Curated annotation (Swiss-Prot):
Reaction(s) catalysed by this chain's protein: 2-N,3-O-bis[(3R)-3-hydroxytetradecanoyl]-alpha-D-glucosaminyl 1-phosphate + UDP-2-N,3-O-bis[(3R)-3-hydroxytetradecanoyl]-alpha-D-glucosamine = lipid A disaccharide (E. coli) + UDP + H(+); a lipid X + a UDP-2-N,3-O-bis[(3R)-3-hydroxyacyl]-alpha-D-glucosamine = a lipid A disaccharide + UDP + H(+)
Taxonomy of the source species: Bacteria, Pseudomonadati, Pseudomonadota, Gammaproteobacteria, Enterobacterales
Species of provenance: Shigella boydii serotype 18 (strain CDC 3083-94 / BS512)
Annotated keywords: Glycosyltransferase, Lipid A biosynthesis, Lipid biosynthesis, Lipid metabolism, Transferase
Record's keyword annotation contains Transferase: yes
CDD domains in the cross-refs: Glycosyltransferase_GTB-type
Name of the protein in question: Lipid-A-disaccharide synthase
Length: 382
């Protein structure tokens, strides 16, 4: 930062989640430095906060090998152009938000030109392809991590990392209102309620929906009043789930929801879900859960050799023990899933203990991440 110009922060976000993080960071920085300038690759939320978009975020938001290969020339052109233009601009700090395949190389290019770089949101290097940590260390001055065990991993390799807490933990209340959520969904306050979340990807919904439905059928034999809510992320996943349900359980009554995953978790006594961010959200909703996951045999064989962690779900990784039951591959079948869920639906000691631990873990990662990230950027800019 010089006397002649305002604090200048360059940012690159590659998808909607990054746009949300970038907007929160910009907002927190503007509160401290009102005349700061923000430029880079931005989505609508970042632009609404005043970020000047040299490229639209959608340019980077490609998924899948085929799509990436089809856009590779354009992506490489954008990265080369940003390397040149940021090099000329000399921002006080560059912040690459997630999108590691694009951003980490860009961060390395900029660091060689003397520009300070931050990578915001650690890739899952602690879980697999751990040698990426060395490239990240060469490319960045600082990694901003959502979770404490991520910082512990970087510390082991002497890569500067700051634990800032998780934005989702900031956004969700420590004590959610179950009855209010039930009112929104039309679920009676005194009924037993189970949430089924078979994933956001097509392959997950295809692999898990039938077994999740069969599990719910078994549970309703014990709890005839069992209300079952199934939030689905979009119309495509809903159509897919409805097709599978028509084959497996055509007359079985469930509440299908368009989105509303968070409300479903808060409203429910227990949840059966695929792993991923949903498990963290379910923990923050204080909803006892069982994780069920299945993938193609070769993919699972490969994952077992590549993944270096003892657990797949974030609640267990945060707790450092099997806090929630994980039933994977051949273990992910209706009898075993139902047996794991039954004591949670009873809403007794097991559920209460899990709820209390979820609350403790929530407090650990509720650190006002936007403010922490802004503070880290300003400290590096000085």
């Amino acid at each position: 930062m010089t006397e002649q110009r305002p604090l200048t922060i360059a940012l690159v976000a590659g998808e909607t989640s990054g746009d949300i993080l970038g907007a929160g960071l910009i907002r927190a920085l503007k509160e401290r430095v009102p005349n700061a300038r923000f430029v880079g690759v931005a989505g609508p939320r970042m632009q609404a906060e005043g970020c000047e978009a040299w490229y639209e975020m959608e340019e980077l938001a490609v998924m899948g090998i085929v799509e990436v290969l089809g856009r590779l020339r354009r992506l490489l052109h954008i990265r080369a152009d940003l390397t040149k233009r940021f090099g000329e601009l000399k921002p006080d700090v560059f912040v690459g938000i997630d999108a590691p395949d694009f951003n980490i190389t860009l961060e390395g290019n900029l660091k060689k030109q003397g520009i300070k770089t931050i990578h915001y949101v650690s890739p899952s290097v602690w879980a697999w392809r751990q040698k990426r940590v060395f490239k990240i260390g060469r490319a960045t001055d600082l990694v901003l991590a959502f979770l404490p065990f991520e910082k512990a991993f970087y510390d082991k390799y002497n890569v500067p990392c700051r634990f800032i807490g998780h934005t989702m933990a900031d956004a969700m209340p420590l004590d959610p209102d179950k009855n209010a959520a039930r009112d929104v969904l039309g679920i009676p306050h005194d009924a037993h309620c189970l949430a089924l979340l078979p994933g956001s990807r097509g392959a997950e919904v295809e692999m898990l929906s039938a077994d999740f439905l069969k599990t719910a059928q078994l549970l309703r034999q014990t709890y005839p009043d069992l209300e079952i809510v199934v939030p689905l992320v979009n119309a495509k996943r809903r159509e897919q789930f409805e097709r599978i349900k028509a084959e497996v359980a055509p007359d079985f009554s469930v509440h299908l929801l368009d989105g509303m995953g968070r409300e479903a978790m808060v409203a429910s006594d227990a949840a059966l879900l695929a792993s991923g961010t949903a498990a963290l959200e379910c923990m923050l909703a204080k909803c006892p859960m069982v994780v069920g996951y299945r993938m193609k045999p070769f993919t699972f064989w490969l994952a077992k050799r590549l993944v270096k962690t003892d657990y797949v779900s974030l609640p267990n990784l945060l707790a450092g023990r099997e806090l929630v039951k994980e039933l994977l591959q051949e273990e992910c079948e209706p009898q075993k899933l139902a047996a794991a869920l039954l004591p949670l639906l009873a809403n007794g000691k097991i559920s209460h203990a899990m709820h209390d631990t979820f609350r403790e873990l929530h407090q650990q990662i509720r650190c006002n991440a936007d403010e922490q990230a802004a503070q880290a950027v300003l400290e590096l800019a000085q």
